[in-house]
Swiss-Prot record:
GO terms for molecular function: carbon-oxygen lyase activity; magnesium ion binding. Belongs to the Vgb family. This is Virginiamycin B lyase. PANTHER family: VIRGINIAMYCIN B LYASE (PTHR40274:SF3). One of its GO terms (biological process) is antibiotic catabolic process. Keywords: Antibiotic resistance, Lyase, Magnesium, Metal-binding.
Length: 295
């Protein structure tokens, strides 16, 4: 497969871009972990930035809601933030102190669901900012990323618990153990085949779990690739960032893996998303936003 990668510098130096998502405004929105800003980039590479009110908020993952608002996690500030496409920001405090909010997604109920890394809970926040929390069965599970599955249930990774969990709209939790010990699952996404696909940052594998809980794992070609985030591409394959090897990876639903080198050395790719142009967009902690175009 032929591809082309473009990279766009962020105006604020040392901004530390981390999470990225596509908005309803034909642009991509991303978090700037070090600059404490939310960024917006058009498919032509034009960038705007918005400062978050809470200082050193620890901006992490960002997701677009169906009503157009962008929601993001503030790991250090212990808040969930919301920004409109006009740049207006509101922040909501989480009841559990030092909960470490990280992964975030929209649920089938229209609410925003998120993980609490250190709080060991899954949270739900309404559009009005009302928060409900559900404690996980096992301590120190370190719930990381979360996504809505094809079955209408929220699925999440347990980075330290070495499990994939799911939670219903009623707060009922089920967990499935990953075969590889200490795999360190992080990113998770709903695949084109109806299954959930996730990355193993320590196991150096891509995992697949059916909605019935059956797990398969696929080895990556590059050792110590440290896969971080994953998304379903417009081509029907899964795309993921390889933070350790400075690559963007691709895996088909049959398990065939390809890897593509990022032009900038040591770019530290993290978040990944599909843009309105159907390209793969990703956040590089080296202060750039990348765009991978399928030729």
């Amino acid at each position: 497969m032929n591809i082309k990668i473009n990279e766009y510098y962020i105006p604020t130096s040392l901004s530390g871009p981390y999470g990225i998502t596509a908005g309803i405004d034909e642009a991509l929105w991303f978090t700037e972990n070090k600059a404490n800003k939310i960024g917006r980039i058009t498919v032509k590479g034009e960038i705007e930035e918005y400062l978050v009110p809470s200082q050193d908020a620890g901006l992490s993952i960002i997701v677009s809601g169906t009503n157009g608002d962008l929601w993001f996690s503030e790991y250090n500030a212990n808040k969930i933030g919301k920004i409109t496409i006009k740049g207006e920001i509101v922040e909501y405090s989480i009841p559990t102190a030092d909960s470490g909010p990280f992964g975030i997604t929209e649920g089938p109920d229209g609410a925003i669901w998120f993980t609490e890394l250190t709080g060991n809970k899954i949270g739900r926040i309404s559009n009005l900012g009302e928060v409900i929390e559900y404690k996980l069965p096992n301590d120190s599970s370190y719930p990381s990323s979360i996504v809505c599955g094809s079955d209408g249930v929220l699925w999440f990774t347990e980075n330290q618990g070495n499990k994939i969990g799911k939670i219903t709209m009623l707060g009922e939790i089920t967990e499935y153990t990953i075969p590889t010990i200490g795999s360190g699952p992080v990113g998770i996404t709903s695949g084109p085949d109806g299954a959930l696909w996730f990355v193993e940052i320590n196991g150096n594998r891509i995992g697949r779990i059916t909605t019935e809980g059956i797990i398969n794992e696929y080895d990556l070609k590059t050792v110590k690739a440290r896969p971080h985030a994953i998304i379903t591409g417009s081509d029907g394959a899964l795309w993921f960032t390889q933070w350790g090897s400075n690559q963007i990876g691709r895996i088909t639903t049959s398990g065939e893996v390809s890897e593509y080198e990022i032009p900038t050395a040591n770019s530290e790719p993290h978040g990944i998303a599909v843009g309105p142009d159907k390209a793969i967009w990703f956040a590089e902690e080296c202060n750039k936003i990348g765009q991978l175009i399928l030729l």
